[in-house]
A protein has these predicted regions:
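Compositionally biased alpha-helical segments
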Residues: 24-94
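Zn2+-dependent metallopeptidase catalytic core
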Residues: 64-67, 72, 76-210, 218-232, ...
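Bacterial N-terminal signal peptides that target proteins for export
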Residues: 2-10
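Surface-exposed patches in mature extracellular/periplasmic domains of secreted proteins
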Residues: 163-181, 243-252, 259-262, 282-288, ...
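Zinc-dependent metallopeptidase catalytic helix centered on the HExxH motif
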Residues: 209-282, 288
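Active-site-proximal alpha-helical
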Residues: 289-367
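N-terminal signal peptide c-region/cleavage motif recognized by signal peptidases
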Residues: 18-20
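Beta/coil-rich, acidic/histidine-enriched accessory regions frequently appended to metallopeptidases
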Residues: 334-528
Length: 528
């Protein structure tokens, strides 16, 4: 269209339709419906000389010849806006609220378009009982005030990271190319925070899938926005299977044939949220503390599913910023994250354990890209889960209540001898010690090594040992400020860790494995 000669004539009688000239790109006239479940419409206007708006029709002139469109074929009266830039995404009516009349602006309760706000990729609905002000969404029995615009701000930051950096969705190949993710604020004072996705229909009856989440004002304000980012993270996890099919995206459990629950959703959602609020990752007084108390557990153990949100930093340092999203998209039913990791990267079980051990050694001093500076005040805070066998000979054994499991680890704070001293750990893996739980003892395996840190921040990593009986050693460097001994449970063969909220944990015979060990130190000892 020649925009210099373009002119717009609006009939005075037609005040119900808005036709703003929003951009120089006037090759298309776009229609955005007030019923946000109705797909946007478009009218070609390329090469037009002028557009005339009358009380009953739209005339588009090309070389003086008019082409007319009656309004009834384009928009319902008082039901749409017309514009020269694409209105972007619309909404899918979720099956969750299939019986809700979103066009009933007079409703006193429930959800409708009149009680919603939108951004480029998200829509926020609040229950009409909260009132009309999107900036003051407050339950009479609760003190928290949610602001729908603040929710959108956090959500859009999530989009930039989860889609733009982490790769959970691929623009141009995603349902989010058409549909906005929907977030709802229910009318209740109690805690509620959940998200995933659902199927639904547009106004034309076309089915699709969309991300959907819920949080009360309490949850919307929690953790400085981290809870919002966590729940939005779940919608992106769901969208993996929406885009690629349910054999991708870990919509299954790990009992061998895909049934049960999946704690990896929570682990990754917390890590995703920390990418939005990185300043909270080592300071919020919550998940890091839980992590310190639980990292001896199986990597996929449900008891620390919210706190297992630190290994992802190592994996993305090792394999790229988008690796977590890549794992989600390339996962295949019924494999768990360890199996997916190994398959995607072509690693053997030994190679996987070696990579994990390197990560845990780095975690001793948080020598990991992206967290190295923010976590430096946390160095030395790992707990020593050992019991003394013989203090005189510096002999210790893994504590039975905190013994390492598959891919669980101990980071033990050690005393620092003088520079040049050779410290040793004479290690014995135990497969028949009394009091421990053995599962597949024939698959027993360990990794163990020393780590030293110098005053200038340089790290020195000792050679990793793997023998059931062996010796790890390290020569203490100059200006050594910290010394650690790291041990990891490294089974020689992987097996899944099932979890089902409706089944007692004791029902799973393959769970609860322990890899105890005894170690006798020379020239150093643990500092409890």
């Amino acid at each position: 269209m020649n925009t210099k000669s373009f002119r717009l004539i609006i009939a005075t009688a037609l005040a119900l339709l808005a036709l703003p000239l929003l951009a120089a790109d006037g090759d298309t006239i776009w229609v955005r419906y007030d019923n946000r479940f109705k797909p946007n419409a478009s009218i070609p206007a390329k090469g037009a000389d002028s557009i005339e708006v009358t009380t009953s029709q739209l005339r588009i002139y090309t070389n003086g010849t008019p082409r007319t469109r009656p309004y009834g074929a384009i928009v319902p009266l008082d039901g749409a806006d017309m514009m020269f830039t694409s209105p972007g995404r619309y909404l899918l009516k979720p099956s969750t609220y299939s019986g809700t009349n979103y066009e009933n602006a007079a409703a006193k309760a429930g959800y409708n378009f009149a009680h919603s706000v939108e951004s480029e990729h998200f829509a926020v609905f609040w229950d009409a009982q909260f009132g009309n002000d999107p900036t003051r969404i407050k339950h009479p029995n609760g003190g928290d005030v949610a602001n729908a615009y603040n929710v959108l701000d956090v959500a859009e930051k999530c989009w930039q990271v989860y889609a733009g950096e982490l790769g959970f969705v691929v623009p141009g190949k995603s349902s989010t190319d058409k549909y906005k993710i929907q977030l709802y604020i229910p009318y209740q004072s109690e805690w509620r925070a959940d998200a995933s996705g659902t199927d639904g229909q547009d106004a034309n009856g076309t089915w699709g899938q969309t991300g959907i989440g819920h949080f009360t004002p309490w949850a919307a304000n929690a953790r400085g926005g981290h809870t919002i980012a966590h729940e939005v993270g779940h919608t992106f996890q769901y969208l993996v299977s929406a885009d690629l099919g349910t054999d991708h995206g870990w919509r299954w459990g790990f009992n061998g044939y895909g049934a049960g629950d999946c704690g990896w959703w929570e682990s990754c959602a917390d890590w995703q949220a920390y990418q939005i609020f990185p300043e909270r990752q080592f300071t919020d007084g919550e998940y890091f503390e839980q992590h310190l108390n639980a990292h001896y557990l199986n990597l996929l153990h449900e008891d620390w599913r919210y706190a297992c949100c630190y290994i992802q930093d190592w994996w993305t340092m090792k394999h790229g910023r988008n690796f977590i999203g890549r794992m989600w998209r390339e996962s295949k039913r019924p494999e768990d994250p360890v199996q997916a990791y190994k398959r995607i990267l072509g690693l053997t079980q030994d190679e996987f354990c070696d990579e994990q051990m390197e990560g845990y050694m780095r975690m001793a001093t948080w020598d990991i890209d992206g967290v190295r500076t923010r976590a430096q005040h946390r160095i030395g805070q790992h707990k020593t889960w050992l019991r003394t066998i013989n203090a005189a000979t510096a002999t210790y054994q893994a504590d039975v209540d905190h013994c390492i499991q598959n891919y669980g680890y101990h980071i033990i704070n050690m005393s620092r001898p003088a520079a040049g001293t050779v410290v040793k750990a004479n290690f014995t893996g135990l497969t028949d010690a009394v009091g421990y739980r053995y599962v597949y003892p024939e698959r027993a395996g360990w990794r163990y090594a020393f780590v030293a840190m110098q005053k200038d921040g340089t790290r020195l990593y000792g050679e990793v040992q793997r023998d059931k009986e062996g010796t790890a050693q390290l020569t203490i460097p100059e200006n050594c400020t910290r010394l650690f001994f790291v041990v990891m449970g490294a089974p020689t063969q992987h097996w899944q860790h099932p979890w089902d909220r409706n089944v007692a944990a004791s029902s799973w015979a393959q769970n609860g494995e322990q890899w105890p060990y005894q170690v006798q130190f020379e020239q150093t000892k643990p500092t409890f």
